């Protein structure tokens, strides 16, 4: 029983200590229209060439990692 009380006390202290770093939206407005989170679609355009370069880079790193694991055994 004492252990349960101690754990409950520690949990309460943990929650109180972390309340300072947490926040949430309490009031929701039904009239956002397009919404605050919706940005223009052209700003999120992904360049296919850049994505292909990143993909090739990751493939090369994966191959090197696989080789190093095989040699370390």
From Swiss-Prot:
Residues 1-24 form the signal peptide. The keyword Transcription does not apply. One of its GO terms (molecular function) is toxin activity. Disulfide bonds: none annotated. One of its GO terms (cellular component) is extracellular region. It is found in: Secreted. InterPro entries: Adipokinetic_hormone_CS, AKH/RPCH_hormone. Expressed by the venom gland. The keyword Disulfide bond applies. Belongs to the scoloptoxin-22 family. This is U-scoloptoxin(22)-Cw1a. It comes from Cormocephalus westwoodi.
């Amino acid at each position: 029983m004492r252990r349960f009380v101690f754990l409950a006390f520690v949990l309460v202290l943990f929650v109180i200590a972390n309340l300072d770093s947490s926040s949430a939206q309490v009031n929701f407005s039904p009239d956002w229209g397009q919404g605050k989170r919706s940005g223009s679609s052209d700003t999120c355009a992904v360049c296919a060439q850049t994505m292909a370069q990143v993909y090739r880079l990751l493939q090369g790193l994966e191959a090197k990692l696989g080789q190093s694991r095989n040699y370390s055994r």
